[in-house]
Amino acid sequence: FFHLEHRDYPTFTELYQFIENRADESYKMISSEMMKHILLYIKSAYDGALSPLFNGITNIDAEDFIDFDMRDLMQGSEECQRAVLFNISTYLWNRILLKEGWTMLAIDELHMYLQHPYMRKTLQSMVLRARKYNAMIWCATQQITHCLNPQYAYEVSSLLNSSPIKFLFNLGDVELGEVKKALSLKDGEIKCIAAAVKRHCLVLAGKERYAIEVGTLPYEEHLFGKGGGQ
């Protein structure tokens, strides 16, 4: 794999045409009928609904920083979401297993991924095993209550309990008792984030609790600008 360029790998078009050209031939190990079944399985990735996602040369660069823009995907069909999430999570975990230096996996809008059973199981496994492969996992969500769905409370509690450091900002207009119970917070700790105060948050580091004000370093404005994420 280290000697091949991304353009050296076949696309689904090439695979489909290769099998189609041989579908009427007879082989000892595979029948013509079996090859036609294979064509049916891969047709959606060849020229069907999944073709825009799967049928083409990869545009993933093997660089130090890779960004997967999932916004449009998460608005698509359930079938597309499952297929792409499976491929991406498999790719990410394989990269982590290589142990090529230190790796950080950052996931924004965590609650959206927790809606998928496969992703819940995958994230749970990653969080428990990542440190063995010189990796760390960083997750963020605007509303932690969106993650506290009773249907998958066990998997989410595993994610929360395995996280050594948590940053909690003001939670907005939500039921604080639910968050207090999920994160084992005391009344005084919940008070720290009960009001919306810009840049103030509660940090949970193991058994330690810190009420802090988040500042900026001199060079950060040059790197990120003043748009506040815009």
Enumerate the language-model features and the residues they cover.
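Long, polar/charge-rich, low-hydrophobicity segments
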Residues: 222-223
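Acidic, low-complexity intrinsically disordered tails
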Residues: 229-230
